[in-house]
Amino acid sequence: MNFKEFPQLTTSRLCLRKLEESDWECVSFLRSDKTVNHFVQRPNADTKEKAIQFIENINLKFKSNQILYWCISLENEQRMIGSICLWNFSEDRKTAEIGYDLDPDFQNNGIMDESMKVVLSFGFSHLGLKKVEAFTHSKNDNSIKLLRRNKFRLKEGRIDKDNLEIIIFEVDRPAMVQG
């Protein structure tokens, strides 16, 4: 995974692009809003400084091949409405974790489902991933439904030692991509 340029992805109505400093307000909102973070334990970015620091950190991690973090925007609009990423790559680069968040004003419209499909396709086809994992809260029904729609299955018996309320799902590369 060495990219000269950030791999922008598009769907019929979305653009998944590189995170920019100008996205700081949405980053701050997504990482600080109580509704968005109800099931997530992570550092907030409740100030412009913290949000910009987060963006700089993400872009440094991209340059060192640790993360692919896409800003989700509606096609032909620049405004960030959410994010989706592949990160926490295994040592052999065959497994990655997927993470995502979305402004509540845009939820329940298929946006994250559409984003996840294009990111999974990219991960399996272009990165050569064999498996993608997702860690989600056991009571986050919307996230669980999204994962199941995208063929993730619950990994029985696997736990997150840092948070026992987290359940772990995984999806394998589809046979048609295996080549």
Locate each region found by the language model.
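Conserved GNAT-fold acetyl-CoA-binding loop/helix
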Residues: 37-57, 68
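Acyl-donor (CoA/ACP) binding surface of acyl/acetyltransferases
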Residues: 1-38, 69, 73-179
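Short loop/turn motifs at secondary-structure junctions and domain boundaries
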Residues: 60-65
